[in-house]
Amino acid sequence: MLSTEMKLTLGLVTAFVSISIPAGAAPKDWPQWRGPNRDGLSAEKGLLKQWPSDGPPLAWRVKGPGRGMSSVATANGVVYTVGVRNKGSGGVWVTAFSPKNGEELWSAFAFNGSDVNGAPTVDGNRLYLVGIAGELVCLDATTGAPVWKKSYHSDFPGSPKPGWGFSEAPLVDGDRLICIPGAPDAGIVALNKATGAVIWKTAVPHQGGGHAGAGYTGVVISQGAGVKQYVTLMGHGLVGVRASDGQFLWGYKRVANGTASIPTPIVRGDHVFASSGYGTGAALLKLEKAGDGVKATEVYFLPGNTVQNHHGGMVLIGDHVYLGSGHNNGLPTCVEFLTGKVAWGPERGPGTKSAAIVAADGHLYFRFEDGIMGLIEASPKGYNLKGSFKLASVSGPSWPHPVVSDGRLYIRDQDNLLCYDVRAK
């Protein structure tokens, strides 16, 4: 999800993992970044288990989302995405499309900007979006009308803009909106989702790795060590803060790098799995109670020449993590979650360079940077490609993450939005 050099559960959900699904979301919806639970997993069933040689049917293709690396969200019977449009005074626009035929339902100006990376978060009748310069807006999800707005730059002074811009998708948790300005006294903030008022803000100590401020991902929720906490990979390390008041709990620097820490961490029970590229690697941490706080202990660390996820995400299905491994590579790889043992991979795969992945109905949907889609069986027994095809539109690096919702595979490609029918007939 970045720019030129890089522009950047199906499985078990244990009783220890706290899930925050946006209000009004139906099981078929994908209302936010990485899906209902921010884990890249769709609950869809009845999907194709093998693709035809030319791929699943293209249901529709439309122009109009605008430029950018934003993925899509589905909710309220609508497909939402965000882009820079040459419309009116230009700038960043949110556009709503019909999932049935791609008809544009409405579009609304969000803010001035030259690019956009983050996906929208839809919560009932509200939509939230962060721009690359730290613009934060809340819009009416039925019309696009503005509700409230903030600016990381002016409301949280000292927020250092990441090299390719802010790229998070804010998290809705109950009545709160959780964001990552990365400022010295507001590394992570909780806002009233209805008004934008600050509930708490917390200083996050620099962990000694990477760079100051935000990374390129959002927040996930963990109940590790019996404490509800917000976990994210910031520019300088992996961190956890207490959800109730923002109290800093723990940090870990080895998975941060000096350029861009991007993948969304995976949480399950008392464990957190994280990875980043640029030769960095991957790690599993165990969270344990320590007095009134929480301590994070490294279970294992895998060097970058074994496993590293540049960007494109990772999914945990059963006891295994599936990802595209390698810097500027998306080589399909399977790793045992609790041990770090590589079950299989890295495999060459049908496409080249980085890959964005999600999972549905026992299969991995790999979108490679060169515009090739691959369907791979999600099994630790071995690599099994079940079909691949070239996307109908390839306008540059194919970095926006795929979305599987209501039997449809959505692909954003700059000013194109593609919808494939992946239902089994």
Regions found by a protein language model. Name each.
Residues M1-G11:
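Bacterial N-terminal signal peptides that target proteins for export
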Residues T9-S20:
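Bacterial N-terminal signal peptides
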Residues A23-K425:
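Noncatalytic, solvent-exposed loop/strand surfaces
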